[in-house]
A protein has these predicted regions:
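PRPP-associated nucleotide enzymes
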Residues: 1-363
Protein backbone atom coordinates (compact mmCIF):
# COMPACT_ATOMS: atom_id res chain seq x y z
CA UNK A 1 0.00 0.00 0.00
CA UNK A 2 1.44 3.32 -1.12
CA UNK A 3 2.08 5.73 1.81
CA UNK A 4 -0.09 3.63 4.14
CA UNK A 5 2.14 4.31 7.17
CA UNK A 6 1.57 8.06 6.72
CA UNK A 7 -2.22 7.80 6.56
CA UNK A 8 -4.25 9.14 9.49
CA UNK A 9 -7.98 8.91 10.23
CA UNK A 10 -9.38 12.45 10.54
CA UNK A 11 -12.86 13.22 11.96
CA UNK A 12 -15.07 14.85 9.30
CA UNK A 13 -18.55 15.05 10.89
CA UNK A 14 -20.70 13.42 13.56
CA UNK A 15 -24.39 13.96 12.86
CA UNK A 16 -27.66 12.03 13.22
CA UNK A 17 -25.79 9.15 14.89
CA UNK A 18 -23.34 8.80 11.98
CA UNK A 19 -19.63 9.43 12.56
CA UNK A 20 -17.59 10.12 9.44
CA UNK A 21 -13.82 10.14 9.03
CA UNK A 22 -11.62 10.87 6.03
CA UNK A 23 -8.18 9.55 5.19
CA UNK A 24 -5.37 12.08 5.06
CA UNK A 25 -1.61 11.89 4.59
CA UNK A 26 -1.60 9.30 1.82
CA UNK A 27 -1.21 11.79 -1.02
CA UNK A 28 -4.12 10.09 -2.80
CA UNK A 29 -5.80 11.21 -6.01
CA UNK A 30 -9.20 10.20 -4.62
CA UNK A 31 -11.27 10.78 -1.48
CA UNK A 32 -11.65 7.95 1.04
CA UNK A 33 -14.08 8.01 3.96
CA UNK A 34 -15.01 5.68 6.82
CA UNK A 35 -18.50 5.94 8.31
CA UNK A 36 -19.82 4.34 11.49
CA UNK A 37 -23.40 4.02 12.71
CA UNK A 38 -25.23 1.79 15.21
CA UNK A 39 -27.02 -0.39 12.63
CA UNK A 40 -23.98 -0.98 10.39
CA UNK A 41 -21.92 -1.82 13.50
CA UNK A 42 -24.58 -4.33 14.46
CA UNK A 43 -24.50 -5.86 10.96
CA UNK A 44 -20.73 -6.43 10.99
CA UNK A 45 -20.62 -7.66 14.58
CA UNK A 46 -23.61 -10.00 14.39
CA UNK A 47 -23.64 -12.78 11.76
CA UNK A 48 -27.13 -13.65 13.05
CA UNK A 49 -28.46 -10.68 11.06
CA UNK A 50 -29.78 -12.10 7.78
CA UNK A 51 -32.27 -11.45 4.98
CA UNK A 52 -33.77 -7.99 4.41
CA UNK A 53 -32.22 -6.72 7.64
CA UNK A 54 -28.76 -6.93 6.00
CA UNK A 55 -29.92 -4.24 3.54
CA UNK A 56 -31.84 -2.25 6.13
CA UNK A 57 -28.82 -1.94 8.44
CA UNK A 58 -27.06 0.26 5.85
CA UNK A 59 -29.88 2.71 5.13
CA UNK A 60 -29.22 5.36 7.82
CA UNK A 61 -25.47 5.64 7.32
CA UNK A 62 -25.76 5.67 3.50
CA UNK A 63 -28.44 8.39 3.60
CA UNK A 64 -26.43 10.60 5.96
CA UNK A 65 -23.29 10.27 3.82
CA UNK A 66 -25.21 11.12 0.65
CA UNK A 67 -26.66 14.18 2.40
CA UNK A 68 -23.09 15.28 3.20
CA UNK A 69 -21.90 14.66 -0.38
CA UNK A 70 -24.90 16.56 -1.75
CA UNK A 71 -24.12 19.52 0.54
CA UNK A 72 -20.51 19.42 -0.70
CA UNK A 73 -21.88 19.51 -4.28
CA UNK A 74 -20.10 16.22 -5.04
CA UNK A 75 -23.26 14.66 -6.43
CA UNK A 76 -26.02 16.18 -8.53
CA UNK A 77 -27.65 13.70 -10.91
CA UNK A 78 -27.04 10.07 -9.99
CA UNK A 79 -26.76 7.06 -12.23
CA UNK A 80 -26.65 3.87 -10.15
CA UNK A 81 -24.63 0.92 -11.42
CA UNK A 82 -25.90 -2.28 -9.88
CA UNK A 83 -23.25 -5.02 -10.10
CA UNK A 84 -25.29 -8.17 -9.51
CA UNK A 85 -25.90 -9.42 -7.04
CA UNK A 86 -23.69 -7.80 -4.43
CA UNK A 87 -25.20 -4.40 -5.17
CA UNK A 88 -28.63 -5.54 -3.98
CA UNK A 89 -27.39 -5.28 -0.37
CA UNK A 90 -26.69 -1.56 -0.73
CA UNK A 91 -29.62 0.90 -0.36
CA UNK A 92 -28.37 3.51 -2.83
CA UNK A 93 -31.70 4.17 -4.54
CA UNK A 94 -33.57 4.45 -1.24
CA UNK A 95 -30.89 6.72 0.25
CA UNK A 96 -30.99 8.99 -2.83
CA UNK A 97 -34.79 9.18 -2.56
CA UNK A 98 -34.56 10.12 1.13
CA UNK A 99 -31.99 12.84 0.42
CA UNK A 100 -33.80 14.24 -2.67
CA UNK A 101 -31.04 13.24 -5.06
CA UNK A 102 -32.48 12.54 -8.48
CA UNK A 103 -31.69 9.05 -9.75
CA UNK A 104 -31.67 9.42 -13.51
CA UNK A 105 -31.22 5.73 -14.32
CA UNK A 106 -30.14 2.40 -12.88
CA UNK A 107 -27.80 0.21 -14.92
CA UNK A 108 -27.17 -3.49 -14.35
CA UNK A 109 -24.11 -5.66 -14.89
CA UNK A 110 -23.32 -9.22 -13.97
CA UNK A 111 -19.89 -10.76 -14.31
CA UNK A 112 -18.83 -14.34 -13.68
CA UNK A 113 -15.49 -16.06 -13.33
CA UNK A 114 -14.38 -18.04 -16.38
CA UNK A 115 -12.61 -21.32 -15.63
CA UNK A 116 -10.11 -23.17 -17.80
CA UNK A 117 -8.83 -26.54 -16.61
CA UNK A 118 -10.29 -25.86 -13.15
CA UNK A 119 -8.40 -22.57 -12.78
CA UNK A 120 -9.82 -19.04 -12.94
CA UNK A 121 -8.91 -17.69 -16.37
CA UNK A 122 -10.65 -14.33 -16.08
CA UNK A 123 -14.01 -12.61 -15.82
CA UNK A 124 -16.78 -12.35 -18.37
CA UNK A 125 -19.78 -9.99 -18.47
CA UNK A 126 -22.83 -12.27 -18.48
CA UNK A 127 -25.59 -9.68 -18.37
CA UNK A 128 -25.56 -6.01 -19.28
CA UNK A 129 -28.30 -3.39 -19.25
CA UNK A 130 -26.50 -0.06 -19.32
CA UNK A 131 -27.95 3.41 -19.60
CA UNK A 132 -25.87 6.45 -20.30
CA UNK A 133 -26.21 9.72 -18.37
CA UNK A 134 -23.52 12.15 -19.63
CA UNK A 135 -21.56 14.14 -16.99
CA UNK A 136 -23.33 12.35 -14.15
CA UNK A 137 -22.16 10.77 -10.92
CA UNK A 138 -21.98 6.99 -11.19
CA UNK A 139 -22.90 5.33 -7.88
CA UNK A 140 -21.92 1.78 -6.95
CA UNK A 141 -22.43 -0.39 -3.87
CA UNK A 142 -20.22 -3.47 -3.72
CA UNK A 143 -18.02 -5.57 -1.46
CA UNK A 144 -14.38 -4.98 -2.47
CA UNK A 145 -12.06 -7.85 -1.54
CA UNK A 146 -9.73 -8.71 -4.42
CA UNK A 147 -11.46 -5.99 -6.47
CA UNK A 148 -11.28 -7.96 -9.74
CA UNK A 149 -15.01 -7.75 -10.43
CA UNK A 150 -15.07 -4.02 -9.76
CA UNK A 151 -12.14 -3.33 -12.14
CA UNK A 152 -13.71 -5.47 -14.85
CA UNK A 153 -17.12 -3.78 -14.57
CA UNK A 154 -15.75 -0.23 -14.34
CA UNK A 155 -13.66 -0.70 -17.48
CA UNK A 156 -16.73 -2.08 -19.24
CA UNK A 157 -18.80 0.98 -18.23
CA UNK A 158 -16.14 3.57 -19.12
CA UNK A 159 -15.69 1.89 -22.52
CA UNK A 160 -19.47 2.08 -23.02
CA UNK A 161 -19.48 5.83 -22.29
CA UNK A 162 -16.49 6.46 -24.55
CA UNK A 163 -18.10 4.51 -27.40
CA UNK A 164 -21.04 6.92 -27.14
CA UNK A 165 -18.84 10.03 -26.94
CA UNK A 166 -19.85 10.77 -23.34
CA UNK A 167 -18.04 10.98 -20.01
CA UNK A 168 -18.65 10.63 -16.27
CA UNK A 169 -18.12 13.47 -13.81
CA UNK A 170 -17.10 11.26 -10.87
CA UNK A 171 -17.79 7.85 -9.29
CA UNK A 172 -19.02 7.25 -5.73
CA UNK A 173 -18.54 3.80 -4.22
CA UNK A 174 -20.11 2.54 -0.98
CA UNK A 175 -18.38 -0.58 0.25
CA UNK A 176 -17.81 -3.07 2.98
CA UNK A 177 -14.29 -3.55 1.78
CA UNK A 178 -10.57 -3.70 2.13
CA UNK A 179 -7.32 -1.87 1.57
CA UNK A 180 -6.89 -3.33 -1.93
CA UNK A 181 -9.70 -1.05 -3.05
CA UNK A 182 -7.46 1.99 -2.56
CA UNK A 183 -4.65 0.63 -4.73
CA UNK A 184 -7.13 -0.38 -7.43
CA UNK A 185 -8.97 2.95 -7.52
CA UNK A 186 -5.78 5.03 -7.55
CA UNK A 187 -4.61 3.10 -10.63
CA UNK A 188 -8.02 3.31 -12.31
CA UNK A 189 -8.14 7.09 -11.79
CA UNK A 190 -4.84 7.54 -13.65
CA UNK A 191 -6.16 5.23 -16.38
CA UNK A 192 -9.49 7.11 -16.75
CA UNK A 193 -7.83 10.55 -16.79
CA UNK A 194 -5.86 9.55 -19.87
CA UNK A 195 -9.11 9.75 -21.86
CA UNK A 196 -11.18 12.01 -19.52
CA UNK A 197 -8.69 14.58 -18.11
CA UNK A 198 -11.51 16.40 -16.25
CA UNK A 199 -12.61 13.23 -14.39
CA UNK A 200 -12.94 14.29 -10.73
CA UNK A 201 -12.08 10.84 -9.42
CA UNK A 202 -13.56 8.35 -6.97
CA UNK A 203 -15.21 9.06 -3.64
CA UNK A 204 -15.11 5.80 -1.70
CA UNK A 205 -17.12 5.34 1.47
CA UNK A 206 -16.22 2.38 3.69
CA UNK A 207 -18.66 1.14 6.31
CA UNK A 208 -17.01 0.81 9.77
CA UNK A 209 -13.44 0.45 8.55
CA UNK A 210 -11.02 -0.21 5.73
CA UNK A 211 -10.32 -3.84 6.41
CA UNK A 212 -7.74 -6.12 4.87
CA UNK A 213 -8.00 -9.65 3.53
CA UNK A 214 -6.11 -12.65 4.81
CA UNK A 215 -3.17 -13.62 2.63
CA UNK A 216 -3.05 -17.17 4.02
CA UNK A 217 -5.24 -19.52 6.08
CA UNK A 218 -4.50 -17.58 9.27
CA UNK A 219 -3.69 -18.83 12.77
CA UNK A 220 -6.89 -20.90 12.91
CA UNK A 221 -6.18 -22.52 9.52
CA UNK A 222 -9.72 -21.82 8.24
CA UNK A 223 -9.45 -18.47 6.48
CA UNK A 224 -9.76 -17.92 2.73
CA UNK A 225 -6.98 -15.76 1.22
CA UNK A 226 -8.18 -12.62 -0.62
CA UNK A 227 -11.73 -13.28 0.60
CA UNK A 228 -12.01 -13.07 4.40
CA UNK A 229 -11.78 -9.61 6.02
CA UNK A 230 -10.12 -8.79 9.34
CA UNK A 231 -8.65 -5.74 11.11
CA UNK A 232 -4.92 -6.38 10.68
CA UNK A 233 -3.22 -3.81 8.46
CA UNK A 234 -6.45 -1.84 8.00
CA UNK A 235 -8.10 1.15 9.69
CA UNK A 236 -11.09 0.60 11.97
CA UNK A 237 -13.58 3.31 13.00
CA UNK A 238 -13.13 4.04 16.74
CA UNK A 239 -16.86 3.46 17.35
CA UNK A 240 -16.69 0.04 15.68
CA UNK A 241 -13.63 -0.91 17.72
CA UNK A 242 -15.38 0.16 20.93
CA UNK A 243 -18.48 -1.90 20.17
CA UNK A 244 -16.62 -5.00 18.92
CA UNK A 245 -14.44 -5.15 22.03
CA UNK A 246 -17.42 -4.66 24.34
CA UNK A 247 -18.56 -8.18 23.34
CA UNK A 248 -16.83 -11.51 23.71
CA UNK A 249 -16.88 -13.14 20.29
CA UNK A 250 -17.31 -10.82 17.24
CA UNK A 251 -13.59 -10.26 16.69
CA UNK A 252 -13.08 -14.04 16.43
CA UNK A 253 -15.55 -14.55 13.56
CA UNK A 254 -13.99 -15.99 10.40
CA UNK A 255 -14.85 -12.88 8.38
CA UNK A 256 -16.21 -9.44 9.23
CA UNK A 257 -19.08 -9.79 6.72
CA UNK A 258 -19.06 -13.45 5.50
CA UNK A 259 -20.77 -13.97 2.12
CA UNK A 260 -23.02 -10.91 1.66
CA UNK A 261 -25.15 -12.56 -1.03
CA UNK A 262 -25.75 -15.76 0.94
CA UNK A 263 -26.50 -13.75 4.06
CA UNK A 264 -29.26 -11.93 2.23
CA UNK A 265 -30.66 -14.55 -0.17
CA UNK A 266 -29.42 -18.08 0.64
CA UNK A 267 -29.67 -17.82 4.37
CA UNK A 268 -29.33 -21.56 4.99
CA UNK A 269 -25.93 -21.47 3.23
CA UNK A 270 -24.77 -18.63 5.47
CA UNK A 271 -25.96 -20.51 8.55
CA UNK A 272 -24.13 -23.65 7.43
CA UNK A 273 -20.92 -21.70 6.82
CA UNK A 274 -20.90 -19.99 10.23
CA UNK A 275 -21.72 -23.21 12.09
CA UNK A 276 -19.09 -25.12 10.11
CA UNK A 277 -16.49 -22.48 11.07
CA UNK A 278 -17.21 -22.65 14.78
CA UNK A 279 -17.51 -26.45 14.82
CA UNK A 280 -14.12 -26.61 13.08
CA UNK A 281 -12.61 -24.27 15.66
CA UNK A 282 -14.14 -26.32 18.48
CA UNK A 283 -12.62 -29.53 17.11
CA UNK A 284 -9.16 -27.98 16.66
CA UNK A 285 -9.21 -25.62 19.64
CA UNK A 286 -6.41 -27.42 21.49
CA UNK A 287 -4.14 -27.05 18.42
CA UNK A 288 -4.73 -23.28 18.04
CA UNK A 289 -2.64 -20.83 20.08
CA UNK A 290 -5.32 -18.55 21.60
CA UNK A 291 -2.90 -15.67 22.32
CA UNK A 292 -1.56 -15.81 18.75
CA UNK A 293 -5.13 -15.87 17.38
CA UNK A 294 -6.13 -12.82 19.45
CA UNK A 295 -3.02 -10.90 18.35
CA UNK A 296 -3.82 -11.75 14.72
CA UNK A 297 -7.40 -10.51 15.12
CA UNK A 298 -6.35 -7.27 16.88
CA UNK A 299 -3.71 -6.73 14.19
CA UNK A 300 -0.44 -6.65 16.15
CA UNK A 301 1.52 -8.56 18.80
CA UNK A 302 0.48 -7.65 22.34
CA UNK A 303 1.40 -6.13 24.72
CA UNK A 304 1.77 -2.89 22.75
CA UNK A 305 2.57 0.59 24.11
CA UNK A 306 -0.04 3.36 23.81
CA UNK A 307 2.17 5.33 21.37
CA UNK A 308 2.69 2.30 19.11
CA UNK A 309 -1.01 1.44 19.36
CA UNK A 310 -2.05 4.93 18.19
CA UNK A 311 0.34 4.69 15.23
CA UNK A 312 -0.69 1.12 14.33
CA UNK A 313 -4.36 2.18 14.23
CA UNK A 314 -3.75 5.51 12.42
CA UNK A 315 -5.48 7.33 15.33
CA UNK A 316 -3.08 10.31 15.61
CA UNK A 317 -5.95 12.77 14.91
CA UNK A 318 -8.50 11.09 17.18
CA UNK A 319 -9.21 13.07 20.38
CA UNK A 320 -6.61 11.86 22.93
CA UNK A 321 -9.23 11.26 25.63
CA UNK A 322 -11.17 8.96 23.27
CA UNK A 323 -8.04 7.17 22.05
CA UNK A 324 -6.80 6.55 25.60
CA UNK A 325 -10.17 5.15 26.60
CA UNK A 326 -10.15 2.78 23.60
CA UNK A 327 -6.61 1.66 24.45
CA UNK A 328 -7.60 0.94 28.07
CA UNK A 329 -10.71 -0.90 26.86
CA UNK A 330 -8.55 -3.10 24.63
CA UNK A 331 -6.21 -3.91 27.54
CA UNK A 332 -9.27 -4.89 29.59
CA UNK A 333 -10.60 -7.05 26.76
CA UNK A 334 -7.27 -8.89 26.41
CA UNK A 335 -7.24 -9.50 30.17
CA UNK A 336 -10.84 -10.76 30.20
CA UNK A 337 -10.13 -13.27 27.40
CA UNK A 338 -7.68 -15.05 29.71
CA UNK A 339 -10.70 -16.41 31.60
CA UNK A 340 -12.18 -18.31 28.64
CA UNK A 341 -10.83 -21.08 26.43
CA UNK A 342 -11.22 -21.12 22.66
CA UNK A 343 -13.29 -24.31 22.91
CA UNK A 344 -15.68 -22.64 25.37
CA UNK A 345 -15.98 -19.65 23.06
CA UNK A 346 -16.71 -21.90 20.06
CA UNK A 347 -19.35 -23.93 21.93
CA UNK A 348 -20.96 -20.70 23.12
CA UNK A 349 -21.16 -19.35 19.54
CA UNK A 350 -22.57 -22.63 18.18
CA UNK A 351 -25.32 -22.46 20.80
CA UNK A 352 -26.11 -18.78 20.23
CA UNK A 353 -26.15 -19.05 16.46
CA UNK A 354 -28.24 -22.24 16.40
CA UNK A 355 -30.82 -20.73 18.77
CA UNK A 356 -31.07 -17.49 16.79
CA UNK A 357 -31.35 -19.03 13.31
CA UNK A 358 -32.84 -22.47 13.96
CA UNK A 359 -35.66 -21.84 11.47
CA UNK A 360 -33.12 -21.57 8.63
CA UNK A 361 -31.24 -24.78 9.42
CA UNK A 362 -32.03 -27.48 6.85
CA UNK A 363 -32.04 -31.00 8.27
Amino acid sequence: MKNWDNVVLVPEFDEQGVACYRLEGGDYENEYYVISEAESRKLLNTPEIVGYEVYNCLVSSTSQMLYYLKEQKKVTTANILSILRGALNYPLEEACYREHIRVHDISFLSSERVFEEEEIAGLEIKYSKLTMVPDSTLMIGDIIASGETLIHCLRYVTDFYRDHGARLRNIIIFTIGGTKGIDILEKLTAEIRQFWPEFEGFITVYYEGIFSTYQDKGVSGINLPDVDFYWKGGIVAPEFRRETLSMCSPIFEKCIIYDGGARRYEIHEHVEEVLEVWKGISERADKIDFKELLDEKLGYPTPISYEDWVKANHYQDIRPADAKWLYRQELGYIESMKDITLKELAEQRIGEFTDALRKYILD
